[in-house]
UniProtKB/Swiss-Prot annotation:
Binds 2 magnesium ions per subunit. Keywords: Magnesium, Metal-binding, Transferase. The active site is at 38, 86 (proton acceptor). NCBIfam families: PRK14830.1, uppS. Mg(2+) binds at residues 38, 225. Its EC number is 2.5.1.-. One of its GO terms (molecular function) is ditrans,polycis-undecaprenyl-diphosphate synthase [(2E,6E)-farnesyl-diphosphate specific] activity. Coiled coil: none annotated. Its cofactor is Mg(2+). Belongs to the UPP synthase family. It comes from Bacillus cereus (strain ATCC 14579 / DSM 31 / CCUG 7414 / JCM 2152 / NBRC 15305 / NCIMB 9373 / NCTC 2599 / NRRL B-3711). GO terms for biological process: polyprenol biosynthetic process. This is Isoprenyl transferase. Catalyzes the condensation of isopentenyl diphosphate (IPP) with allylic pyrophosphates generating different type of terpenoids.
Length: 258
């Protein structure tokens, strides 16, 4: 079942936010949270601003949510930053989006290192501009020994493409005698995905009021809890993430059982 902005904190105005955080941390925190960051363009349009202004503001929210997820002891935070379909957007917007990782990491990387955050990237990196790849590679290299939160960017990522690529690699290994067809299993296919070293997301969040998955981690979210909110990504705050996690904690996850 899916909820929007379920008001678990209604009536608790006299309670400090820090106290609420500590209360939530006493419950089970999802190991892996994935977020479809949506609504940057519409946020800007409502303010008569260019779409790129929304993307810039959205990156500031990434900083806040990353720090807060780390504080909550979330182990993996995957952010859908740019899909394989996003190349269809206006060139000016795409060019700006390709510059954002360099701008973002140029200022935020020292804090990520200090916070013990490890940066990873999934997606088709070969199509990314050189300056974008270099920024991501530097961040991954500089944080590879960090043992805290894994900040995983899905950049030029499409789930169908990921699954097709995994099957192609499995077929190649089968032809070379590395695996036998009777050995193929869900676990084996998972091991060929870009997320093979990560747990599957337990909680998937999408902002902006859209109720779809948009070709994001289709295999990995088979048993994820979905949480949708009408809030645009630039307006997404720590309180919203805490609300989503509290909602998650109140759900019964039966995985097909009783």
């Amino acid at each position: 079942m899916m909820f929007k902005n379920f008001p678990f904190f209604k009536g608790k105005k006299d309670t400090s936010f820090d106290h609420l955080v500590e209360e939530v941390k006493k419950g089970y925190i999802p190991e892996h949270i994935a977020i479809i960051m949506d609504g940057n363009g519409r946020w800007a349009k409502r303010r008569a601003m260019p779409r790129i202004a929304g993307h810039h503001e959205g990156m500031q929210v990434v900083k806040k949510i990353t720090k807060f997820a780390s504080k909550l002891n979330v182990k993996v935070l995957t952010l859908y930053a740019f899909s394989t379909e996003n190349w269809k957007r206006p060139k000016k917007e795409v060019d700006y989006l390709m510059k954002l990782p360099e701008e973002f990491l140029g200022t935020f990387l020292p804090e990520l290192i200090e916070e013990n955050v490890q940066v990873r990237v999934i997606g088709q990196k070969d199509r990314l501009p050189t300056h974008t790849r270099r920024a991501m590679e530097k961040a991954m290299e500089d944080t590879k020994e960090n043992t805290g939160l894994i900040l995983n960017f899905a950049l030029n990522y499409g789930s169908r493409d990921e699954i097709v690529s995994a099957v192609q690699h499995m077929m190649k290994d089968n032809e070379e005698g590395k695996i036998r067809s009777e050995e193929v299993s869900e676990e084996m296919l998972s091991s060929y995905l870009m997320t093979s070293s990560l747990p599957d997301p337990e909680l998937l969040i999408r902002t902006s009021g859209e109720l779809r998955i948009s070709n994001f981690m289709l295999w990995q979210i088979a048993y994820s809890e979905f949480w949708f909110t009408d809030v645009y990504w630039p307006d997404f705050k720590e309180e919203h993430l805490l609300n989503a996690i509290t909602d998650f904690q109140h759900r019964g996850r039966r995985f097909g059982g009783v």
